[in-house]
Amino acid sequence: MRLWLCWLGCYTLLLWALRRRMWAGPARYLRSPLSRSLYANMMGSHGPPAPGAGENHQWYVCNTEQLSESLQPIFVQSYLDQGTQIFLNNSIEKSGWLFIQLYHSFVSSIFSLFMSRTSINGLLGRGSMFVFSPEQFQRLLKINPEWKSHRLLDLGAGDGEVTKVMSPHFEEIYATELSETMIWQLQKKKYRVLGINEWQNTGFQYDVISCLNLLDRCDQPLTVLKDTRSVLEPTRGRVILALVLPFHPYVENVGGKWEKPSEVLEIKGHTWEEQVNSLPEVFGKAGFAIEAFTRLPYLCEGDMYNDYYVLDDAVFVLKPV
């Protein structure tokens, strides 16, 4: 209770200080993002569009001339579609929920002393990710909306929001996750959560395995790739895999500390296209070939400082060889 009263007092002082600054000039002179957010909410304004909102088409641009000859014909051009725009609109709206954002910021600062950021997000139910819309998923896999298969395994599924995009196509949905709070979110969605050392030893195979933005955040990415190959249905099975490029692998530990992984993927080059060119060899060592790939934005819900966050993803469909 004392902690809450202390926080409330600090917040009141912040409002008082902000009010004094407002008398000195309009909102454009408020340099702090928090101050601008407070001002906009108090004035009933949603503020200007998010910076760079008019440049969203750049998220999908690939210079195909810089791709190797074998990769050029299997590149799938993607675009900003309705599903992506809905996520962006919802994220922008949530970032304007001032008191909720302040509460999230306060809780995060306390819990970060003994919890990872991922677990904090799972506890608060915030920070959902977006990799692809249902239409983008179907186009990449070359399936129609009515297509059905048996088993899906989503490795590192987080809160299950991306799993939800794929789940209508499968009879059984399995997921893995390290964070206990994210496991709780997955169980609320009725997904079958398997242990980190359990999914490789279930005795059955999966028709589709998704590994979305996991390899750059796990300790043994090569082992994950090889284990994925061993439990994939050998003829019709497919892996849908996303990597943030440029590739910067780190593993998050309790307390938000980041460490280098014990296994290294030999991804070469500097640009998005150069690193994509080196990936057929990486996947080949694990028994996969690239069937199709695209460039998509890896989006995350924002906070009081940004409407949303975005990284550059390369999303691959891999087939066993």
Swiss-Prot record:
**Which residues hold S-adenosyl-L-homocysteine?**
E177, N213, Y298
Subcellular location as annotated: Endoplasmic reticulum; Mitochondrion
Signal sequence range:
1-24
GO CC terms of this entry: endoplasmic reticulum; mitochondrion
User: What keywords tag this UniProt record?
Assistant: Endoplasmic reticulum, Glycoprotein, Methyltransferase, Mitochondrion, Signal, Transferase
Tell me one Pfam family matched here: DREV
Primary localisation category: endoplasmic reticulum
Q: Which domain of life is it from?
A: Eukaryota
So what EC number does this one have? 2.1.1.-
**What's a GO biological-process term for it?**
methylation
Assigned protein family: Belongs to the METTL9 family.
> What PANTHER family has UniProt attached to this entry?
DREV PROTEIN (PTHR12890), PROTEIN-L-HISTIDINE N-PROS-METHYLTRANSFERASE (PTHR12890:SF0)
Q: What is this protein called?
A: Protein-L-histidine N-pros-methyltransferase
